[in-house]
Amino acid sequence: MGLPSLLVEGVIGCTLVGGLVAVGSAALAVRATIGVVEFNRECVRGARRIVSSGGRCLVVQSPYGNPNQGLIRGEDEEIDNVEESTPVELTPLIEVKAEVDGKEVVVSKKRVVNRHLRQRFVRSIAIEAKNHFGGDISPSKANYLSVSKFLTGKCKERHVVPAHTRDCVSAAMVLVFTPDVHEIRMMAGLASDAAYGIKIAMASILNRKGWCWRLMVNPLDRARWWEMWCVVNGFDSNKPVTFPKXGGLFYLNGVETKIRRGGHPSVIEVDGQCPLKERKLYVQNAITTGYEYRVHNHSYANLRRGLLERVFYVERNKELVSCPQPEPGSFKEMGYLRRRFHRVCGNHTRISANDLVDCYQGRKRTIYENAAASLLDRAIERKDGDLKTFIKAEKFNVNLKSDPAPRVIQPRSPRYNVELGRYLKKYEHHAYKALDKIWGGPTVMKGYTTEEVAQHIWSAWNQFQTPVAIGFDMSRFDQHVSVAALEFEHSCYLACFEGDAHLANLLKMQLVNHGVGFASNGMLRYTKEGCRMSGDMNTALGNCLLACLITKHLMKIRSRLINNGDDCVLICERTDIDYVVSNLTTGWSRFGFNCIAEEPVYEMEKIRFCQMAPVFDGAGWLMVRDPLVSMSKDSHSLVHWNNETNAKQWLKSVGMCGLRIAGGVPVVQEFYQKYVETAGNVRENKNITEKSSSGFFMMADRAKRGYSAVSEVCRFSFYQAFGITPDQQIALEGEIRSLTINTNVGPQCEAADSLWILNRKYQ
């Protein structure tokens, strides 16, 4: 192909392209002209519709409707027909009187619900929710779940049917998460020029310059010269009044009971005149929920009242009376359960003294080593079973009861404990497993972590279609353990040890107790038949055994028991509530116990077991102590803070234990984290754990939790359990992080109570 041919083809191509461009331009011009004509035509039609409809056609209708505009404006919607009602098939049946064939009869008809009333109801529950959750609520998942649960509960209280409940809750949610006129006015007031001026005035007063500066600025003001004269003569300059921030470390002296009443012929009293030795309770009050704790002194007055009111008598109608006794033959009825317990538990033999000593550590191990060595030289004697009584060093809440009867501890000699421990120490775990099998699942919650306890409760809860939990415990369980109850308990042990004569002799010493209690200002000597002595080796085992078997004997229905001594929770079907409540109180009274049944609960988080509630953290369940109690109780120490280092060591021990059992839990993990941060790099003192060998430290022994982010699901579950809203949780955590615990020991002062949201006085 030559050059002329290329030129010819180029000319032809350009001509064709130019023609196509021209045709396209003409087509666009024609379409634009048509579009202008169509637009003008639609404008004319639109103007005609606006004029003919009076402007109503301008309102854009949502495909889902917009029923909440009137609610948000706070006004009722205009309804053409006031009698218009909700769909008939969604309303409940009601019984009304009607006249049929001249006779008045009762007929069922659908309730008519006026939409004006619906709107007022929606606004009413929305206002209740705003008041409960504190006004403007952040749009988090936890808050959404909490508000939805709250609104649904309000509808259930008014017996709203499920279809209407869904409708009302969805409408009220819009109002709750939308600022109302009151919140707008509040924020407008806070942002006003007047409020700004007041804040500036306050800041200027609090940030006053020194007296020298004020004198130079106003040299002709006689007040400035008089202030200088006062400063030169040793007085303070004129400064704004400030109040010292509460917080720091101090101690409280032990308390004496103010009540002295009663007496018993089996108690010999010797009131001495020696000076009293006071106990001390150490406190940090920078972070508190308002509860105050004290500790009883080991004194004659406390010892006397503790023995009389917790061992010999019970209170009824504000009078001291003898403990109730079981009905004759009541424990014989449970012979079949003893035989079943023996079959499941099997036969056992005692362990060696060395094996028993190996079960302990620290100071207690040394005591039992010496006792075991003495038994090699001298056999067990009757006097080894005598009791040595003292007042328990226990923190008690003065806000709940200002002057309770002190608790007494009544241990027998270490020699007796070694002999009895050789039988029961290792056997105890087999006995718990036997009780589990009798009840059909984990029952005795001894030795489990908080996660394991909660998981066992959750498993028991899921065994029922409509579960309900009924908590119950026995008032002063140890005091109500009669001779008949002890004999039944002992028969269970003897059956498993094939009637061992030495064990029978040891257990017989518990039927008639001889004890003495010494204090610095007096002493008491007494004899008591029956009653559980709190220092016995078999206290925990015996209480669990009696509680589980008596409850099993009383409950002839399908149920599950969660037990820890005298603290019990029974889970069953809702249809069996009346049977359980009626049989618990009357049934336990036949065995000489005073059973107190709590209100049934229908939600997992509402269960209370050992002063803890189940909380779901997003991955699993765990038991959480009530923050109102734990955050105040864990601010008080029975371990002496002799110096700042001891105080920090205690803070570190408590903080680390708290994080191990409550890591990832709202509010409380920040509380324990603040303890750890305050302690800094102080060396851990393991002796503190031994001195504070309480349930708190024992719970943390096998726990493996730690500080972690709090999930939205956990915040919702925490709200369900303790009523602290998610926004309040976040606010409390921020408050705790901003606080500083002063570890210098100072004078006694009132608690800071900075976490007032948790304080029951304000709820």
Swiss-Prot record:
GO terms for molecular function: nucleotide binding; RNA binding; RNA-directed RNA polymerase activity. It catalyses: RNA(n) + a ribonucleoside 5'-triphosphate = RNA(n+1) + diphosphate. Keywords: Nucleotide-binding, Nucleotidyltransferase, RNA suppression of termination, RNA-directed RNA polymerase, Transferase, Viral RNA replication. It comes from Carnation mottle virus. SUPFAM superfamilies: DNA/RNA polymerases (SSF56672). This is RNA-directed RNA polymerase. Readthrough of the terminator UAG occurs at position 246. Its EC number is 2.7.7.48. RNA-dependent RNA polymerase that plays an essential role in the virus replication.
